[in-house]
Amino acid sequence: MTRKVILAAMLMAAFAQGTQAQDLSGQRSEKQDVHMIPGKKLDHHGLIVSPTPHLLNVDAANRLDLQKGVKVIDKKGKFADDVKFLTANAKGIRLTIDFGEKLAAKAGVKPVSGAYSLKANAKGIQIVGYDERGAFYGLQTLRQIVNSEMAKGQMPYTTCNDYPDLPNRGVVEGFYGEPWSHQVRLSLIDYYGKNKMNTYLYGPKDDPYHSCPNWRLPYPEKEAKNISELVQACRRNRVDFVWAIHPGQDIKWNEEDYQNLVHKLDLMYDLGVRSFAIFFDDISGEGANPVKQSELLNRLAKEFVKVKGDVTPLVMCPTDYTRLWANPKPTGSLAIFGNTLDPSINVFWTGDVVCSDLTRETLDWVNSRIKRPAYYWWNFPVTDYARHIIMQGPTYGLQTDLTNKDLCGFVSNPMEHGEASKLALYGVADYAWNIANYNPLDNWERGLVDLTPEAHDAYRTFAMHSCDTETGYRRIESWETKSFRIDNFTDAEFNALQKEFEKVKNAPAQMEANCKNALLMKELRPWLTEFGKLGNRGLKTMQLIKEYKAGNDQAFWDGYVNNRMSKEDVAAYEKHKSGTMVLQPFYEQSMDDMASGFFKKLTGKVPAFYKGIGTYATLRTTQSKAMFDNDSTTYYTSGNGQNTGDWIGADLGCVRSVSEVRILQGRNSVDDVDYFDNTVLEYSLDKKEWKALTGELKKQYIINWKTDSPVEARYIRIRKLKSDKRNWAAVRTFEVNPTTPERLSFPVEAGNLQAAMYGFDENPCTSFINEGTLTMGVEKDVKGYTLLLKLAPGKSLVCRQLNAKGKVLATTNIDQSFCKIELVKKAAKLQLDGSAEIFEIIPEK
């Protein structure tokens, strides 16, 4: 499940290919609130045990010397492969490992699966588990203590009495996108065991034998062998391999398909699977019938689970897996399950929305209907709805006063990047084991060291700036970094930010040199590459601020044009983003502010540089720039569902005479659903009193307004009128008074005349590539021109001044990006010949 919200990215691609539009209004309703991370970093004095034990007392003054080895006394012969981190010696320190209910009760071990006690004293080391899994977990704690910085090959006298808070803890592989490789799955299973997670739900969305239409068919030989290997790896790590099947989209509620389902489960049983889940998520039609689902599950529990004898209770995912669209009434599916579903069957729940925090409120709501503690499916750190992000931030948003009476289990739906998901899973394991003592920030700090001990400083720098999705389930990012606007900062703030950009620039090379986890580096590398570039352009921006403040026009403009991101740079960054909350916005805002200030200094005018405004929080971020980038293939998106009264607009920077507005709504103008389907175009001087420019505009992707009687306005907007649509809202283009040849007071000739208008739009942030010759008329009273250019290395531009008859009066070879041209007498035309990027041609009167 990454749930329908996460299908959004895939559906966008479908729309682009002309597929019939689907209404996603109920699928994307995550709040855009961003909360700080609870907890604080602790000093563990060289000893870290994770998950955090319930009781751990260490006497560092008294120790057992393990350097000569240990004598392993494995009472039940189950742990030969689990003690290899120790040196065996028949005359060494005694290590006794045993488990069983009576033995555990005598040792004071809590009677729950996975509980254990660990003691180290003059008699040796004793591990007692409530069950085999508990003894295995005791060995994991022993391994962490022995390998700790504090122990240094010795074992301090220790008393540990520990147990898990939740019976089911782990991972569900339920995301869309590229499935994990077999190698990554095996690596993750080892990670689950080391971190005391006991559940791995196998349900890849792109596994054709898990879902429609091939769920009835057996796995081919190679795939079956791989699953068998995963089962064996899970057994070694005391993890339940839960194979999930997703039959709901085309299941027939008849005996034939019931037997097809049982046959498939039998085939999986023969591969070693002893735990099963039935998913009915993200389906429609008859397969979503909760009565039929309940009947099927109850029959399977009776005729398959109980008959087999060694199969764990079933887990099911309902179609109504979130409060967002679940029917709350007694006739709803959840209430039906509560009244009819076998009590042994656990029921998944994702919370109030698809990607949401774990709270008592959401559990109380669902538990009162399903009449059992819910099994929480947490859609974090999954990113298949934001695949340009690799989530490396802390694991938080989890209420810490819950118990197993509130939820029966907790599983994370990770990213398609399995190794990179481990940082979040480190937190998932810690939380599910010891809820009350979960410290998200400290857990994250520990996880960084656990994953990359030899490169954790560089990894920390990257991870801190790679946390937020930009949309949907928002996460805090860059919380230690303070940015500023170019006209409001102190020397200390400047120096601190410059130092951070230096760390960002260097982090990728440090990771490459020191990180020994090849699988992790393979996943992170595309993001690290872009991260290093971000650090470099951030440092250049800091230097530019100095040049800007010093008033060095030539040095500033040269630095500015060389620090702008090319289309290729933007495309690469958009695919692998980081620093989206602080670092990249600082770069973009600073570059824009300096360009605008520079233009005003040269002209005395406020540039025609517009900014997004409106009811959506994302309009106040750099995301809104997509409306003003002169590119109809990019778009701003609200990130929130629309409501009546919502609006999207432009701040024109100053009061202007407005005679034309052109807006392209939606992500396309054909069949997109993300637009105001009933709207009105309005203007204002003060953003308080608004006046209409149009009447109701219904189902219009393209809005064109033009008049011969301009209005005076500082703000222009489209406002949503009453309609049932609750989708996000998207805008590709928001043009006010677009520069056209007809609007200019002088003639222009160019190979691409429309593109050439960007050289006269009074916006220094726009540009066009001149290839060949551009000729423009000289206005009366103009004494010269300032040219804001970008020249390719080793290239120059020829500027010719012509009289009215076309005779050349003067020729200038331009080899600098910032250039002033003084007009000679009788100059009637200016001609630029050559290849250059032209930002603005500014007349001087």
Residue map of PLM features:
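Feature activates predominantly on carbohydrate-active enzymes
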Residues: K71-I73, G77-K78, K110-K264, D270-R274
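Disordered, acidic Ser/Thr/Pro-rich linker "stalks" and the adjacent N-terminal cap
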Residues: F599-V658, L664-N678, K687, E696-K699, ...
